[in-house]
Amino acid sequence: MVSEQEILESYPQVCPSGSLSGTPGNLDSEQEAKLKEFRELLESLGYKERLDDSTLLRFLRARKFDLEASKIMYENCEKWRKEFGVDTIFEDFHYEEKPLVAKYYPQYYHKTDNDGRPVYIEELGSVNLTQMYKITTQERMLKNLVWEYEAFVRYRLPACSRKAGYLVETSCTILDLKGISISSAAQVLSYVREASNIGQNYYPERMGKFYLINAPFGFSTAFRLFKPFLDPVTVSKIFILGSSYQKDLLKQIPAENLPKKFGGQSEVSEAEGGLYLSDIGPWREEEYIGPEGEAPKAFQL
């Protein structure tokens, strides 16, 4: 079995110069000292895994480099990982119903943006919870969410980092609200709330860019009202767009990487799994796959 250290050594561990403050390669002396202190603290508590710079700095950034708050967050995450069975999720969980679920709630990764990030697309406006819950459960959907997060961390990011030539830590997300109604939004609220909790608490600082497209009338106004109460760094990553979103997406995502349905040129044949199931990106390209191996799939076509 390949060790965590071998995998870390196989791809870049430093973000580009000028990246967000507090990321690997973009630390001031105080942040450097906090990182060292944080690692020593966790080692003294018996932790041996997930102590690399990138991981520890994400927890520190999420808690504004407050050592005690970062420690609590890290400990809660490790406790949750053990209880949820995260370390063996690839062996234990198989989402064979995914091809059917994708028809009622499309969620998928597709290629990369201009900064080398994996592009994650979720078509929330297409959700049909009534049909979906005939073939799966919210519990299994959340298991799949964690499965995808782990694939993102263990396979997608290393491959994207090798291709980019620097450390890629985040995703570029497109959330499509086309066709969403109050009733469908209310239906999926419970899942979205739980999914958000998992992302914020256990996979912090993974959002690079977030595009909310086909936003209903008034959504942008509401967001502007809440902006003063949100973290400025978070706000800088979020873009609320209506139906004329194509130019904005193409500024961040190359046309050849953006699906045709969103204004790009990328098309995928059904033989390859179609847009929803093909999972195309550097993590499927042999030259960028390292000792971790190719990203697994939770289902068989």
Curated annotation (Swiss-Prot):
Pfam families associated with the record: CRAL_TRIO (PF00650), CRAL_TRIO_N (PF03765)
Predominant location: Golgi
Region (Disordered): 9-28
Biased composition (Polar residues): 16-28
Membrane topology: Peripheral membrane protein
Residue stretches making up the CRAL-TRIO domain: 97-270
Entry keywords, A to Z: Golgi apparatus, Membrane, Protein transport, Transport
GO biological process, alphabetically ordered: protein transport
Source taxon at top rank: Eukaryota
Compartments reported by the entry: Golgi apparatus membrane
Gene Ontology CC entries for this record: Golgi membrane
Record's function text: Required for transport of secretory proteins from the Golgi complex. Catalyzes the transfer of phosphatidylinositol and phosphatidylcholine between membranes in vitro.
Protein name per the record: SEC14 cytosolic factor
Origin species: Kluyveromyces lactis (strain ATCC 8585 / CBS 2359 / DSM 70799 / NBRC 1267 / NRRL Y-1140 / WM37)
